[in-house]
Amino acid sequence: MFREAYFDDNRREYAAYQQPAVARNQCTYDRHVARCYGWVRTTLGDGLVTDLIADLNGNPAQTLEEYLSEHGLDTLIQNAVCNLARFLRTSLILTKNLMPHNLVLAPNDLGYRLVLIDGLGLSTFLPLAKYSQYFAQRHIEKRLQWLYFRLEWEVSDRSISWRDTEATFRFSGMRLEVESKR
């Protein structure tokens, strides 16, 4: 029988905040990852406290999913996605699939920066990416390719369900070193 904590997504998320890449990047990781402050007891049980990413009016920031449905994959968002990809490739912070509803748009002087508010860590059976730089790079590249694939679906006519579309995703392998420095 599994302990209840095994199924507690907050506990897994908290453990993901302890990954070495997050600890190494304490001064910079919060540019694209909501900062975690620890636990607070609530009437519903323990809750994980993270940053509230806000828009210019102080309201919760819009999700990437919401933005895409209103504006499509415009230049502002393409740039924000490129900046997030560059950050993940450099920092080697491990994430689960980068879901558009788990990325919010924080306004900045260039337009937006994407901030991951949920989905840190690994959901793989063998967590090799935790122990090997090569596998961490491979894991991140696969997650980024999956995100690009998902973004194309988000702005499509959605005539095919995401479940059916996702089944066709194929990881195309690691990028060449020259490409990754662009």
Regions found by a protein language model. Name each.
Residues 16-19, 79-83:
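Long, highly charged amphipathic alpha-helices
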Residues 20-29, 108-109:
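Alpha-helix termini
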Residues 32-39, 94-107:
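A short glycine-rich, hydrophobically flanked beta-strand micro-motif that places a catalytic Asp/Glu
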Residues 85-87:
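Terminal, low-complexity interaction segments
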Residues 6, 25-77:
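Conserved structural core of kinase catalytic domains
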Residues 54, 100, 121-122:
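Short, glycine/acidic-enriched loop or turn micro-motifs at the edges of active sites
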Residues 1-22:
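ATP-binding glycine-rich loop module of kinase domains
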Residues 2, 68-76, 80, 89-96, ...:
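C-lobe/activation-segment region of protein kinase-like
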